[in-house]
Structures are given as C-alpha cells and as structure tokens.
UniProtKB/Swiss-Prot annotation:
Belongs to the peptidase S24 family. This is LexA repressor. The active site is at S134, K171. Residues 28-48 bind DNA. Pfam families: LexA_DNA_bind, Peptidase_S24. Homodimer. The keyword Coiled coil does not apply. The record marks A99, G100 as: Cleavage. Represses a number of genes involved in the response to DNA damage (SOS response), including recA and lexA. In the presence of single-stranded DNA, RecA interacts with LexA causing an autocatalytic cleavage which disrupts the DNA-binding part of LexA, leading to derepression of the SOS regulon and eventually DNA repair. The keyword Lipoprotein does not apply. Its EC number is 3.4.21.88. It catalyses: Hydrolysis of Ala-|-Gly bond in repressor LexA. One of its GO terms (molecular function) is serine-type endopeptidase activity. It comes from Paraburkholderia phytofirmans (strain DSM 17436 / LMG 22146 / PsJN) (Burkholderia phytofirmans).
C-alpha cells in the first residue's frame, strides 16, 4: 500500500465518508469547502496526487468522477474495490413517473446514456432526473441525473429514492422508533415522516452516483 501525506489522508477519508454516507463522492468544490482549501483547484491537485499513488481513479470531465481503488498504508479502513470495467454501462433515464406504474416501465424511459462505471460507487440500474431543490445541500440540484441502484432495504443515513403514494421522492433516510423520517437537505423544505408499515411508502432504491448535465 502507498504511504499518504497527512493532507492526502484527509482528502481520502473525506471521499470515503461521503461515499459511505451518500453513495457518491464529493465534488472538488465540496472537498475544498470541507477541508478549508482556497479553491477547487487545490482540491484537484490533491486528487491528482492520490491518483498518481494509485488509491483513487479520476474520470475526466465529471465533477464527481472519483473512485476509490485501495486503502493507503496504515489506514484503518483498508480495502480494495474491483477496477472499473472498460465497458460502458447503458442506463435508462427516467423522467416523470406516472402514478401506480413501475418506475422502469417503458413509458417512463426518455432515453439511454452510455456511462463510465467509474463514476459510481456501485453499479446503478437507472438514472433518475431530479426535480426540485429539496436535496440542494447534499449537492443534488434540479435537473441532475441521480444514479439509482434498485434496493428493497437501505441503511440509516443513505440517500434513497422512494414512492410516497403517487409521488417519487429523493430524501435522506433516518430511522425513528415508530417509523421513518425522510430528511430534506434544504431548510426550505419540510421532512416527511412515514409510520411503520405504511402502505403509502415503498423503497425504490439508493443513490450510488450523480451526473450533472453537460458532463457527457
């Protein structure tokens, strides 16, 4: 394993925590803000140093195109992820979802995107076009394409895609003693509480990456 400087270790740990918490890596601007760098360019320099040492892989042209490859020497979180395949993924883009129909129903698919697997923390099943700003403070904006992996269960703190009655929503999951709280990452939006066993709630999947239009 490669020895990292103290600052490089901070950047590496920040990326790892972001992936564990949200399913996708931080942007250069988010790294700079979190670690007190003067600009996103400073974060980029540290990312390139980590890439040269072989502990991350960078996908050109993508603000969140960071993939962890291995844990550095003496890290308490040593691990190795399979290297990204050279084959691109063909992912359906889901636009608006009609009430009562499966999210991957043919009529919901507006087009397909060819995507580099290195953009995602896990293999996604589809892309969902984000509508609204309820997850703004998590770096998810209106018009972004959220990479979703289909799941029937999710961990506390993960960003999930869920059905609530006839609506599909993106929120952060928080488990409560008598149900679930779906947390908005924007103080202008209210959180949503779902009682245990509610027939109105169905988990569709978890976020494993994000693509901003113009990054293709």
């Amino acid at each position: 394993m490669t020895k990292l400087t103290a600052r490089q270790q901070q950047v590496f740990d920040l990326i790892r925590r972001a992936i564990e918490r949200t399913g996708f890596p931080p942007t250069r601007a988010e790294i700079a803000a979190e670690l007190g760098f003067s600009s996103a360019n400073s974060a980029e320099e540290h990312l390139r140093a980590l890439a040269r040492k072989g502990v991350i892989e960078l996908a050109a042209g993508a603000s969140r195109g960071i993939r962890l490859l291995a844990g550095p020497e003496d890290s308490p979180h040593q691990f190795t992820l399979p290297h990204a395949s050279i084959m691109q993924l063909s992912l359906p883009l889901i636009g608006r979802v009609a009430a009562g129909s499966p999210i991957l129903a043919q009529e919901h698919i507006s087009q397909h995107y060819a995507c580099d697997p290195a953009l995602f923390s896990s293999k996604p099943d589809y892309l969902l076009k984000v509508r609204g700003l309820s997850m703004r403070d998590a770096g998810i904006f209106d018009g972004d394409l959220l990479a979703v992996q289909k799941r029937s269960e999710a961990k506390d703190g993960q960003i999930i895609i869920a059905r609530l009655g006839d609506d599909v929503t993106v929120k952060r999951l928080k488990r409560r003693p008598n149900g679930l709280e779906l947390i908005a990452e924007n103080p202008d939006y209210e959180n949503i509480f779902v009682e245990t066993g509610s027939a109105e709630f169905a988990l569709e999947g978890i976020a494993v990456g994000l693509i901003r239009p113009g990054e293709f």
